[in-house]
Regions:
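N-terminal active-site segment of His-dependent metallophosphoesterases
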Residues: 1-79
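Extended active-site neighborhood of metal-dependent phosphoesterases/phosphodiesterases
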Residues: 3-15, 76-172, 211-213, 237-239, ...
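A short C-terminal boundary segment appended to hydrolase-like catalytic domains
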Residues: 3-8, 18-19, 277-336
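Active-site-proximal beta-strand elements of phosphoester/diester hydrolases
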Residues: 21-34, 134-148, 177-181, 254-264, ...
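Acidic/histidine-rich helix-loop elements
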Residues: 24-47, 102-121, 145-158, 188-197, ...
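Divalent metal-coordination and catalytic microenvironments
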Residues: 28, 64, 69, 82, ...
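Active-site environment of divalent metal-dependent phosphoester hydrolases
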Residues: 32-33, 72-77, 97-109, 142-150, ...
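His/acidic metal-ligating clusters that form di-metal
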Residues: 51-63, 150-256, 308-333
């Protein structure tokens, strides 16, 4: 097992460019006090979120963004525990909901309505725009919809109304990052070891990428798949370009999609995003020690085909291949 043991650069991006701004992105904490085991390592979820707070408090960050799934199942006690842990955070934070944070038809408990999540973790009604240092962050809801269709499962979709709102809300003169839970890319098509499961990717990925590109949003950050990726997205569903990995993005029209590793499951990490006038660096920050990392790896390896893919990809040297994207690398020389 070779997982990340220290802060590791996931991507060097040509854009966004902005006055120096640093923020953390955390996803899929799945906090619970009442469950153990599984590939999500439920009995460690509280301590992993506490580790996020401790680590971020030691850094000079402009803020922290949660990309969804703060809780295991969206129960009131789970939300209360999240709030208790986050009360120790020094930096400002805001969040978008994940599929486990919102009511589902199959819940065996009463999940608080979305308005409760918004009141606790958002500066305004969803969707909203927040300022972090020298850039704007547009936060969209991919986990629930007005007609209730997403209540039937774990799929994600960003409504047309939100995309229309974004078109008006984004300031074209201000570098902008978008955050939503379900990604536009499909991990099963980026990496063959992962199964081709429908709910891994936004149902309307094409429309979302087109809207992001039209609004001049150059970077989208999501969670949901519990695995760190970085890819250039063209707007054709499933056609995401993470190869070639290195080289300038001068001729690339589209959006860069980054997915955030889970705080709960292997590799138990979060992202640190540093934006400068020269470009953006996205780094993976591990949360646990060697013992914690080994435990999470063993749970992943022993679980379903999807999670054994995590272990197999790690064994194949996935983390040794970082950065996955390096858009600021010099162009390769060619011989005449």
């Amino acid at each position: 097992m070779t997982g990340p043991t220290r802060e590791t650069e996931l991507a060097h991006l040509d854009r966004p460019k902005a006055p120096e701004t640093t923020f953390a992105v955390v996803s899929d904490a799945h906090v619970t006090a009442d469950a153990e085991g599984t590939w999500k390592v439920f009995h460690r979820t509280e301590s992993r979120l506490e580790a996020v707070v401790d680590d971020v408090n030691r850094r000079d960050v402009d803020g922290l963004v949660f990309a969804g799934d703060l809780t295991k199942d969206g129960t009131s006690p789970e939300f209360d525990r999240v709030a208790e842990i986050l009360s120790g955070l020094d930096a400002p934070y805001f969040a978008v909901p994940g599929n486990h944070d919102v009511p589902k038809t199959f819940d065996e408990h009463e999940t608080p309505p979305l308005s409760t999540f918004v009141a606790a973790h958002c500066p305004d009604e969803l969707p909203y725009r927040a300022r972090l240092g020298g850039l704007d962050v547009v936060c969209l809801n991919s986990a629930s919809d007005a007609d209730g269709t997403l209540r039937e499962g774990h799929a994600g979709r960003i409504s047309d109304a939100q995309l229309d709102w974004m078109a008006d809300a984004v300031d074209p003169e201000t570098p902008t990052v978008a955050v939503f839970h379900h990604p536009t890319t499909h991990v099963g098509r980026l990496f063959e070891r992962f199964p081709d499961t429908d709910h891994y990717q936004l149902q309307n990925a094409d429309a979302v990428v087109e809207a992001l590109d039209s609004a001049n949003v150059e970077l989208a950050i999501s969670g949901h798949i519990h695995w760190p990726t970085a890819a250039r997205v063209s707007g054709v569903s499933g056609e995401s370009d993470s190869r070639p990995r290195n080289g300038p993005a001068d001729s690339f029209d589209g959006v860069t999609q980054v997915t955030t590793p889970a705080a709960c499951s292997f590799p138990q990490a979060y992202l640190l995003v540093r934006v400068t006038p020269e470009g953006t660096t996205v780094s993976l920050v591990p949360l646990g020690d060697d013992e914690a990392r080994t435990e999470a790896y063993r749970y992943a390896a022993a679980d379903s085909a999807r999670d054994s893919a995590v272990a197999e990809s790690t064994d194949d040297g996935y983390f040794d291949s970082f950065p996955l994207l390096d858009e600021r690398a010099p162009k390769p020389t060619t011989s005449d």
